[in-house]
C-alpha cells in the first residue's frame, strides 16, 4: 500500500521562494509508485492552502517570479488526535490520513521548531529534527555556544539584541575582530540579511538591515579559508556524505548566489581534499549534528583554513532541495540518488515516531 506523504512548503519567511523551489524538486523526484503526495502550501501571510499537484506553483521555472497558487481551501490541525488530525477548514472534512509530513519550509516558523512543535502535538511523523534540534540550530548564537562547549571550533563573535543596539560600536569591534567583519541575523538562513563589512559606514548600514530580519544579530570575525559543506543523514546512527566545496564568484556565498544566479558560485563535488582532511570534516560534521540534537538530515558548513583548521560556520536542519542545492548533490555523489534520499528521509521520520511512541507518557503502566 502506498504511503501518504504531506509536503508542507512556502511559509511566512524571507526564504519563501527557496522553499517553493525545494518543494518542486521533491515533488518531481518522489516515487509515485510508493507514495501519494498531498501538497500543503503556506503563503507569505501564513495562510495554509491545500493544493493540487497539477497547479500548485506559478512561474515555477523562474526563481525570481515563482509563487504559490493560493486556493480557497485552508486547513485546521487537531492536536492530540490519533487520526484525521488535519481537516480542511472550509468543508471540515479530514484529509486522507497522512503517514508522514515532509516539511520543507525554510527559515522562520518552519525551521525553528515552530512547525515541528505543531506536528508533534498532532502526532504526525515528520522529516527532520524535532523541536529542540530545530530551535537551537536555527539560532546561530545558541548553536555556536553549544558547538564551542562540545569542543568544536567556531568563529569569534558577539551577539547583540535590538534593545542593545546603542551599545554596538564599530571601533571596539574592529579592534577585537579586525576587518572585514560579518554581520548576520541570528535566526535566518540562506544568507538572508548577511553583510560583509569593510568600513564604518557599511557597518552601521548592515546593523540596521540585519535587525529588520531578527531581534538578535551576530558580529563575527571573517575566517579566511575554503568553504566546505558536508551532508548528514540519519537519526541515532547518522552518516556523513563526501564533502563539497563552494567557490563563490562574488565576495561571499550570498542569497543570490545560492538560489537566483546560477553563475554565482561553482559547486565542486567532491571537494579536492586529502583523505585525512575528508575524514576530519566528516567526523566534525557528525559531532556537530549530535551536539545540536539533530535528527533526519542536516548540512554542516565549515571553513577550512590554510593550516587545515576546521571552523564550523553553521548547521542547517532543513537544507535546500533546489536544483542547485548542495545537500542532495552531496548524497548523489556519495551513492544515494535524489529519489532514494527522499525515501530514506521518510523512513527515518516514521522510525523516529515509532521510537517516540514507545516512551511512557504517564507514571502508570496502563
From Swiss-Prot:
Necessary cofactors: Mg(2+); Mn(2+)
Catalysis performed (reactions): 2 D-alanine + ATP = D-alanyl-D-alanine + ADP + phosphate + H(+)
Pfam family, one: Dala_Dala_lig_N
GO molecular function, one term: ATP binding
HAMAP family given in the database record: Dala_Dala_lig
PANTHER family noted in UniProt: D-ALANINE--D-ALANINE LIGASE, D-ALANINE--D-ALANINE LIGASE A
Biological role: Cell wall formation.
The protein's name in its UniProt record: D-alanine--D-alanine ligase
